[in-house]
UniProtKB/Swiss-Prot annotation:
Sequence ranges of Polar residues compositional bias: 285-297, 480-508
SMART domains: FOLN
Domain Follistatin-like, residue spans: 40-62, 240-262
UniProt keyword Signal present: yes
Organism placement in taxonomy: Eukaryota, Amoebozoa, Evosea, Eumycetozoa, Dictyostelia
One function term, GO molecular function aspect: cellulose binding
The protein, known as: Prespore vesicle protein
Record keyword Aminoacyl-tRNA synthetase present: no
Segments of this protein annotated with the region Disordered: 285-514
Gene Ontology CC annotations of this record: spore wall; vesicle membrane
Biased composition (Low complexity): 328-391, 398-413, 424-457
């Protein structure tokens, strides 16, 4: 019964529809194939078999039903293509299903119209006079802007920091200030990506940039656009610790919004110590060069100003000093004149010998005394008789023969004095390296030697070495004292324990006696 009633209703509805279509007048002329005019529905024309309805402030064509002109509608226009039932839009062909042809920026374009079956705008439909735009990652309805001759992006004019992109069929100026992802159909867009409808499917696309995005300039990804006066300029972006590159020994910190590379405190202290060590070493080397030049100049003075005879005499006397033979000392004493030899023996008192020993003991090191050319000159002047006699072995024998009468009576004194002088010379003699430069530093050299000059100032390296040696010696002394104290404490503990043990042993004996 129900199926029968339903079939009757369908038959009645079909008969009414056919009658209504036959009674519709599409203007002048016959059917669609002969160029009949359709009903203007908003900004487009509905084909035959469709109904023009108003939804959410927009005129849309519904397939089937009655074709009625809405209030305020206008009839007119000619469809092209005959039975295609679609209008050519801008010379590019007919629009797709769900699109309508409209003018944007003075040109006809196919755009999607929002209806209850079409794309929504952020979960809602836009009213008449509004367009759907993407702002800060959120779809929303905004008023359709008035057409402007200055527009550079459809009906809009994009600023230097905006992107021109098509959203829902409209060219729009957009920029992304957010960083949170947002939903786009079945996808998730990440700024600066934008959500657009492509082929009836919402997709995430990257925004195209205009040629000049900073006034009349173009800023790349490493620069940012700032306003300066009446114009715009591209300046480098402020780096963060994520983009700034530091060396291996440095770390990145943010200071007043800028990323800076610094050295950690521990590494900085170590680097300061290394730099101080290098500075001290360089200063020591710089100070050591003038001292070496001064010493070399002082050593070179006697050789430059000295006479050839004196230089030869010094070389002759250097050889016996290296060999240090006692015979040469005896020969020197024998070659001395009889009067001088006797006077030397008479005045060689113990007090003078002691004074000579004290003078030699308080003498400066060889490194300081080597830089005294005066001693060499005095030594050479007083050693002239020995130099002349040493160069003539024949005169040496003659001198011995002629000196026999004078030395015959003084033989005991000479023999007694010889061992003492020879031993004193050997005891107070300096190392061979130093005595080689001073062959005749015997009684004559010691008597006529001038007072020692003040020692040269120590360099920083020598001072540091002396301080290091002093600290090592002090540390060794303290360690030795601690060791001695430990030994004493151990001995005292041992004695105390022995006394306590002896007392404990003595107590039972006294108790037994009692």
């Amino acid at each position: 019964m129900r199926l029968y009633l339903l079939s009757l209703i369908l038959v009645f509805y079909a008969s009414v529809s056919s009658a209504s279509l036959d009674s519709v007048n599409f203007g002048r002329g016959g059917g669609w194939g002969s160029g009949n005019q359709g009903v203007l529905c908003g900004t487009h024309y509905c084909p035959p078999g469709s109904t023009c309805e108003s939804k959410h402030g927009h005129y849309i064509c519904r397939p089937g039903g009655l074709i009625t002109a809405p209030s305020g509608g206008d009839s007119g226009g000619i469809w092209t293509g005959g039975d295609k039932h679609k209008k050519d839009c801008g010379g590019t062909g007919c629009c797709k299903e769900g699109q309508y042809c409209t003018k944007l920026d003075g040109k006809e374009q196919c755009v999607y119209y929002p209806d209850d079956k079409g794309p929504q705008c952020g979960g809602s439909f836009c009213r008449e006079g509004e367009i759907c735009v993407l702002e800060h990652g959120v779809l929303g309805c905004l008023e359709n802007p008035v057409e402007d001759s200055k527009a550079n992006c459809g009906l809009f004019h994009c600023n230097y920091n905006e992107y021109c992109i098509m959203v829902n069929g409209y060219l729009q100026c957009l920029f992304s200030n957010g960083t949170a992802p947002f939903a786009c159909g079945l996808q998730t867009c990440v700024p600066p990506q934008l959500c657009v409808k492509v082929e009836n499917c919402q997709q995430c696309v990257s925004p195209p940039r205009p040629d000049n995005n900073c006034g009349d300039k173009y800023c790349d990804d490493e620069h940012q656009c700032v306003r300066k006066g009446l114009g715009y300029e591209c300046i480098p972006k402020r780096l963060t610790c994520e983009t700034k590159k530091c060396e291996a020994s440095q770390v990145c910190i943010m200071v007043n919004g800028d990323a800076q590379c610094i050295v950690p405190p521990a590494a900085a202290a170590a680097e300061i110590r290394i730099n101080n060590f290098r500075f001290n070493r360089n200063s020591v080397q710089r100070n050591a060069k003038p001292a070496q030049q001064q010493r070399s100049a002082q050593h070179a003075k006697p050789a430059q100003h000295g006479k050839p005879a004196q230089h030869a005499t010094q070389q002759q006397h250097a050889k016996p000093a290296q060999n240090a033979k006692p015979v040469q000392h005896n020969a020197q004493q024998q070659h001395a004149k009889p009067a001088q030899h006797a006077a030397q023996q008479q005045h060689a008192k113990p007090a003078q010998h002691v004074a000579q020993q004290q003078q030699q003991q308080h003498a400066k090191p060889a490194a300081h005394t080597a830089a005294k050319p005066v001693q060499h000159n005095a030594q050479q002047q007083h050693a002239k008789p020995a130099a002349h006699t040493a160069a003539k072995p024949v005169q040496h024998n003659a001198a011995q023969q002629h000196a026999k009468p004078a030395a015959h009576g003084a033989k005991p004194a000479v023999n007694a004095a010889r061992p003492v002088q020879h031993n004193a010379a050997q005891q107070h003699a300096k190392p061979a390296a130093h005595t080689a430069a001073k062959p005749v530093q015997h009684n004559a050299a010691q008597q006529h030697a001038k007072p020692a000059a003040k020692p040269a100032k120590l360099t920083n390296a020598q001072k540091l070495q002396q301080e290091h040696q002093r600290q090592e010696a002090l540390a060794k002394q303290q360690a030795r004292i601690r060791q001695q104290n430990l030994v004493k404490q151990a001995a005292q503990k041992k004695q105390t324990s022995q006394r306590a043990a002896s007392k404990n042993q003595a107590r039972p004996a006294t108790q037994k006696r009692n």
